[in-house]
Amino acid sequence: VVVAGHMDEVGFMVRNIKPNGGIEVLPIGGLVGEVFISQIVYVYTKNGHKIPGVIGSIPPHLKTNNNSSIEALIVDIGASSKEEVLSYGISIGDMVLYDTPYIETFNGKRFIAKAIDNRYGCGLALEALEYFHDKTFDFNLAIGATVQEEVGLRGAETTTNMFKPDMFIALDASPLN
């Protein structure tokens, strides 16, 4: 038996740096473009910097087509040239994640945060490890966390190919209620 949460989250990846300093991004996971316009994001560089930015797109009155897709989004970090962006250590492939605070709901019964389903699943996996660590079973039990759930359940597939379990219990949560 394998029990696992997943520890990846949706986000973006730097795909191009424009001459004017705008950063074009690729979606990672199931994202809908227009909901991200004006959202604060951070570019995480390979040298450890966390650079703030905001997601924008070409204004409707300046568009030459009606492309409102996620691929049309641009991250603005305040740089005025490609050279300036590169001087910050930003490169193709860097992660871009949106910023969401971790807060309680007004009634104090729930939490609001990005990737809460992932965190919930990983937390349950840790609780299961703690609970079952000294128990004996007549079957093998593997507890952990997978990655790449947001891009096609790849980690869970790799785990099942590796362990060949009779049962895989995926720990995840609904984003609403």
What residues fall within each predicted segment?
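N-terminal hydrophobic/helix-forming segments and targeting peptides
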Residues: 1-177
